[in-house]
Amino acid sequence: MARYNPFSFTPGPVVFFTTVIYVGLFAALLVTHLTVPDYPSDPPAGINLTEAWADLEHITRRFHPYNSHANDHVREYLLSRIQGIVATKHLDGSQVEIIDDLTSNATFSSGATSVYFEGTNIIVAIRGSEDDEPFNSTDRRPNNGGVLVNAHYDSVSSGYGATDDGVGVVTVLQLLSYFTESHNWPKRTIILLLNNGEEDFLNGAKAFMRNPISRVPHTFVNLEGAGAGGRATLFRSTDTEVTRFYSKSKYPFGTVVSGDGFKKGLIRSETDYRVFHSDLGLRGLDIAFMEPRARYHTVEDSTRETSMNSLWHMLSAALASTSGLAAVTGEEFSGSESLDNGRVNAGRGSDGVWFDLFGRVFVVFQLHTLFALCVTLLVVAPITLIGLTFGLSKADKNYLLARKAFVYSSDDDNPVQLYGWRGFFRFPIIFISATAVVVALAYLLVRFNAFIIYSSPFAVWSMMLSAWFFVAWFFSRGADAMRPSALQRMYALIWLFIGSFVLLTIVTVFVNNYQVVAGYPALFYFAVVFVAIMLSYLELFFAPTKSAYARHFEHDANSRRNSDSASRPLTGSTTAARSDDRPVADDDATEITSLLRGDRRGFTRYGSRRDSASEGGEDQAQGSQRLDLGNVYPGEQEWSGKLPSWIWIIQLLLLAPLVIVLVGQVALLLTSALYQTPSDGNSPLFIYLAIAALSVLLLAPTGPFIHRFTYHVPTFLFLVCLGTVIYNLVAFPFSRDHRLKVYFVQRVNCETGANTVSLTGLDSYVQRIVGELPSAQDQPLNCTTPDVATRKELKTCEWEGLPAKVVPNAAGAAPFGNETNTGRWLEYSIHKGNRSNKATMLVVGLNTRACRIVFDSPISGLAVTGAVSDPRFKPVGAAGSREVRLWHREFGQPWNVGLTWDAEEHAKLSGRVVCLWSDANTGSIPAFDEVQHYLPVWAIPSKISDGLVEGFKRFEI
């Protein structure tokens, strides 16, 4: 009785090991992605997590956007906390300096928008032990630079800002406490920045650039939030050298794919990272929360939805990164020359590739290393396989694509059939069929339930994965049952090699030409496929030579010439030899041969030259050899019996784990980043196609082994596929835990008192939502495409809403309705000089510190009284400005704005003066309160722009 081999290439081991590897690694990836490591019971000296959580609860009690009174209260609290921390450490001004910056302002432009902003930043400078220069010196600074740690303390008008950016703010407070401990004192100067105004246009970071201390740091750590809890990921990094310091974190998390997503605009939101790197010239990191996006900028961005574990995850990452950067005393982050464009010369880093492994290990290497490895593999791998093919041919063991072998000579009219072609085209046909099914499912979802991904991303993933696997198994198993082939595994690997070669070539081009490195998994994918196929080539050296096999066949044919079993095929349904059943030469089946064709034989073969020679040539028969062909898998070619039966498991261990980990990590990150972006106007089709493509990449390594699977696992997956298809097609796409985000704004004509409330959201759903609001009932809805460029896929529905009460009476400070007093909400006056293309406009809004001037035609010049010129900033862009945004640090203060325009093209300058109100804490915006109260449980409001209420008046010069 043959001994059972638990590692042989038979159904039992294949099903067991493949299932264990895939299920185990999928589970490990999901646990890493969906859970957060526990915070320590004994944190490092200087860190107090209980205190940090109390700070977070305090600053997130109310909405606190820049344009709100609650924002001032948060600022006062943070100043008092900073002063308290410094006081308890008994530090003087030479060691730690607190800068209450109420003087810096910035005037700049972006596209057709100009901004004048007055900052209210809080800056704390901890002098490094090896830095002696004064903090604010403009000509003497630390040669090796300092480290900037930034978070913004303003929230949006529709959210409490727990993770955006409350956790970042309390992290900065804890870093202040930590680094002012004597045993933790940094070698390099650390600048802690709590900036105000990030949510509105990255204004706070721009104002920081106007402070002389902004020239001290050369590196930075930016702390942000675009979700509500979970792990803080490394969103992006400027270079490899800086990223290595993040790798010291105990729980690193992230991949360079997110950085490329920012570069290519897949992630639309921006952070202060852009200002610090692109405008100021610093090198650093962007650490941020990223999901769930449905809670981003809503009331669910609160302490209830996050945790102390999440707080510790960001804090520990910031602590490790800052500690490492602050310990560098060399010239790594200093350029050799000073720059005359106002930027800091922080040296030049190298583009990098980085990713974590299960949230514990962080891999970092340079882009040029990736490129070199890609090119090397693309050259070495084909040459190696060509060499192995040549070696097999020299050894007479190249059964690949071999159709027949000759006993005597090539003109033998009845050669031995080898069936080397069998199975060659099988894998691409199966691969294309299975891939077509998952792509079709993507289009099916878009057609019938496009937004199910919003609440059920893992149902979509389960559908795609189970569909691809079942279809691939069905065709593979069917083909194997009809025409078994010992080369099916090897041919599948050859096709995987070809496909991954093409993929790596594309990735290499993008790496070299565009510095896009998100395709880094392709390098490892191709590498493991190359090693696996190389093992299959080496495996063939264990096969008998084709000539010896043919002689064995001839000897057996002579000995059993008169057997009655002359019609059996030349494959091993048992381990016994079947060499007497030689098919004729034209019986070599391929993938395009009919499956119903039998082994046709005629009497002519018995009159062939070989028969005559065998009957009369005793010498030849005596010279022939009988081979031990080993254990042939039932139905497969007899020459394969001596091939090692355990090579497959090495190939599986090469292919599956690395592909699952690297591709699976990218898949989870992209899912988290994109699955709730349709509410922002993103196309769901792109998301479904991305999931389909990643499903194929994840399961393609099963292709060489899938034909050995029994029906049990595929049947289970078929039922999973069937259930998830039905669910994904009929389930409602939103829920209490995954609310559809809709965008609110109220516009008031301050001249007529007319007000319009609008909600912007997904077509058909936003109409249902508005229909449930009492103020909108029995009113005709006007639903149009929004004028916001990034939300063209959405619909805006307008109706006459509840009057806003954003300006209190001067005497009793009681609110009043807009039907009588809106004319006083904002005032403007225009003074036109002697020149026809110049004018000065005085603008003031009551109970606000944010107004705008929107022009019907562009202006060419802008000068705001109190603004300071900065060569780094241009007040007006090259194509002019159509909008000027004005921000004051005090409520109700006027702006004096000088305007210049092209009088030849536009004799008159016209437009609107708009003032904004963003404070939803006091009940002064009843329409917003109504939306929050009456919205269905599956929807949630957010702000669409800087203000919740916009009051306007027309003007003409």
From Swiss-Prot:
Intracellular or extracellular location(s): Vacuole membrane
Database matches in SUPFAM superfamilies: Zn-dependent exopeptidases (SSF53187)
Marked site (Transition state stabilizer) residue numbers: Y296
Cofactor binding description: Binds 2 Zn(2+) ions per subunit.
Listed Basic and acidic residues bias regions: 603-613
GO molecular function annotation: metal ion binding; metalloexopeptidase activity
Active-site residues annotated for this sequence: E198
Glycosylated residue positions: N48, N105, N136, N782, N818, N834
Keyword Hydrolase: yes
Residue spans crossing the bilayer: 11-31, 370-390, 424-444, 451-471, 491-511, 522-542, 643-663, 686-706, 714-734
Residues annotated as binding Zn(2+) 1: H152, D164, E224
InterPro entries attached to this UniProt entry: Fxna-like_M28_dom (IPR048024), M28_fam (IPR045175), Peptidase_M28 (IPR007484), PFF1_C (IPR053975), PFF1_TM (IPR053976)
Main localization of the protein described in the UniProt heading: membrane
Family membership noted in the UniProt record: Belongs to the peptidase M28 family.
Role according to the record: May be involved in vacuolar sorting and osmoregulation.
UniProt name for this protein: Vacuolar membrane protease
Organism: Pyrenophora teres f. teres (strain 0-1) (Barley net blotch fungus)
